Amino acid sequence: MVEKRKIFTVLCACGIGFTSYTSCISAAAIDNDTLINNGHKINSSIITNSSQVSAVAKEMKPFPQQVNYSGILKPNHVSQESLNNAVKNYYNDWKKKYLKNDLSSLPGGYYVKGEITGNPDGFRPLGTSEGQGYGMIITVLMAGHDSNAQTIYDGLFKTARAFKSSINPNLMGWVVADDKKAQGHFDSATDGDLDIAYSLLLAHKQWGSSGKINYLKEAQNMITKGIKASNVTKNNGLNLGDWGDKSTFDTRPSDWMMSHLRAFYEFTGDKTWLNVIDNLYNTYTNFTNKYSPKTGLISDFVVKNPPQPAPKDFLDESKYTDSYYYNASRVPLRIVMDYAMYGEKRGKVISDKVATWIKSKTKGNPSKIVDGYKLDGTNIGDYPTAVYVSPFIAAGTTNSKNQEWVNSGWDWMKNKKESYFSDSYNLLTMLFLTGNWWKPIPDEKKIQSPINLEVQSELKEQD
């Protein structure tokens, strides 16, 4: 039997990153659907088989979209064109360093290369489901700048499906390795699957679903038969993977991708997702009221009910699983996006508290942010890294008093190059800060009817 995958770590060049893991007032958004940028052709060193390049659909939301979300700041000390160019340049470098399609065991399959630690079960790991999710979101949002974006995206999806989970085949196993035997060998990690499913909704809005891949159908299938069936717990929480117990309270806040979950509701009509969102916000509030009332920080892992920090060395992850470390550092971006895209006021309350604390802590200087804090705000780390800095900058976008903070943070972020984990999350945050992470809006005629299926039936592999 395959050993159940707990949590694995991403070894960064600078620091260690840990991977994978209501009703609202809609925020007004202004889309620029008419701006079409010249495509950027993929580096020839990345494409190894030109026959894999196929006809692609015209982008419906080409980069740059430069959306202006109501109540959300952008860096305003430079032009929108400058912001867009910084994203393009960062993406070009990211793609050259991390985007690969050299799998001899899966021709045409793309993956995002990232070093890991953990237990790859004797395989040589090249990437993860976490990286796959990051890459799929980034690629679909950069379509229009990158003329090969759909080919790349479809290749990333090919890999995600080939490396299906050993438990629920509608999800992705957490390891990518250049070995046929690795396909279907590993169980899942919740965060990677959430990003992958969400990216499919973006792909549906970017290219439509009438081509060789029905993105909408694949997304709805993954959302309902994969994530809902295996990751949503009986208490409306999110477990750590399809190996996790459905009765557990063990969860990882970096998996609490509120705007993803709200999109899942909009594209399926299943109110389960609203219940999950409400539960996660309540868990966050109850946790911070007791353990971090001054900072608003949350720990890498949360356990039990009422919620409390996981013990140190939880799941043999790190000695800081009870603190704001390389998992929790990603949380502020996931929270603020719910306010930006859907007007969720609970997201603003959390973002405002975190931003107020970190600005005070650093005296308004983003370069003074360090890589790790105890819940009371005491330093654990000693240097800034983008996977901490950029989400803290994103949290500051909800209040006009933070304009200088956002501007300074942008200047720090835009040229910061470190490693797969930090660079990927930095790029995702740059897309948000510049208005180039747009909201997927469903076609009402194609909303899936809510389906409540038995978990066992969902886990049967489809022919």
From Swiss-Prot:
GO MF terms, alphabetically ordered: cellulase activity
Organism of provenance: Bacillus sp. (strain KSM-330)
Hydrolase among keywords: yes
EC number(s) stated in the UniProt entry for this protein: 3.2.1.4
Enzyme class, broadest EC rank: hydrolase
Protein name in the entry: Endoglucanase
Keyword set, alphabetical order: Carbohydrate metabolism, Cellulose degradation, Glycosidase, Hydrolase, Polysaccharide degradation, Signal
Active site, per annotation: E130 (proton donor), D191 (nucleophile)
